[in-house]
């Protein structure tokens, strides 16, 4: 139970506008409500709650490194699950460079272990850096013939098949291409239909 319910409600009321404002781009219809309910389940001890929140607070979450306006490395806290015996947290670490990805993953492992948790790497996919190769020039030439303008060459901060393929086909030139997408991985995600054709 909260020792001072009125104070807890006051603090939440003071912060909710600030929190909703921060989330307005991704959750424009967000709401925060507080109501008293009965609860007869288990709760974390005060000590465990503090350790867990402190651990969450210092885990790398979000942008880690940018270069020339492009995201190079990030780490995102994703799914949080709880049952009677444990709390499970999934983090996704991504980078164009495997060394940077491994460094951040090692940091996550060490932080969790320092707070008394257990951590493991369940899966990963390799990074991939765009290379300036004749294939890019050829692709641009074909694009120009088909569409009459220059192809946009850009880097994306997502998992691409090229990273997986490059591990097996290291001498093969490759590019990744796709449609024009806005608001990726958000409720407002949109794809420009003409760019899919």
Task: List each model region and its residues.
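Midchain, well-structured core segments that form catalytic/ion-binding scaffolds
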Residues: 1-93
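His/Asp/Glu-rich mid-to-C-terminal helical/loop segments that flank catalytic regions of hydrolases
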Residues: 9-11, 48-65, 102-110, 141, ...
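Structural signal for hydrophobic packing residues in well-ordered secondary-structure cores
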Residues: 12, 16-27, 60, 108, ...
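Generic structural signal for residues in well-ordered beta-strands
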Residues: 30-36, 119, 150-153
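Zn-dependent metallopeptidase/amidohydrolase metal-coordination segment
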Residues: 72-74, 78-87, 92, 142-197
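C-terminal catalytic subdomain
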Residues: 87-105
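Short, contiguous acidic/charged loop-to-helix segments that flank catalytic cores in large enzymes
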Residues: 95-96, 126-130, 190
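Generic long, charged, amphipathic alpha-helical segments
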Residues: 112-146
């Amino acid at each position: 139970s909260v020792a001072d319910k009125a104070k807890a409600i006051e603090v939440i009321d003071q912060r909710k506008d600030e929190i909703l404002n921060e989330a307005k781009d991704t959750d424009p219809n967000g709401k925060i409500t507080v109501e008293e309910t009965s609860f007869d389940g288990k709760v974390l001890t005060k000590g465990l709650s503090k350790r867990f929140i402190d651990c969450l607070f210092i885990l790398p979450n979000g942008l880690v490194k940018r270069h020339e306006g492009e995201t190079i490395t990030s780490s995102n806290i994703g799914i949080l699950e709880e049952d009677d015996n444990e709390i499970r947290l999934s983090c996704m670490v991504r980078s164009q460079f495997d060394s940077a990805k491994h460094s951040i993953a090692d940091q996550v492992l060490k932080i969790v272990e320092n707070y008394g948790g257990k951590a493991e790497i369940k899966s990963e996919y390799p990074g991939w850096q765009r290379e300036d190769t004749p294939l890019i020039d050829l692709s641009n030439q074909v694009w120009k013939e088909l569409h009459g303008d220059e192809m946009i060459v850009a880097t994306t901060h997502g998992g691409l098949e090229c990273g997986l393929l490059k591990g097996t086909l290291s001498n093969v030139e490759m590019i990744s291409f796709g449609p024009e997408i806005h608001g990726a991985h958000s409720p407002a995600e949109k794809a420009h239909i003409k760019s899919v054709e």
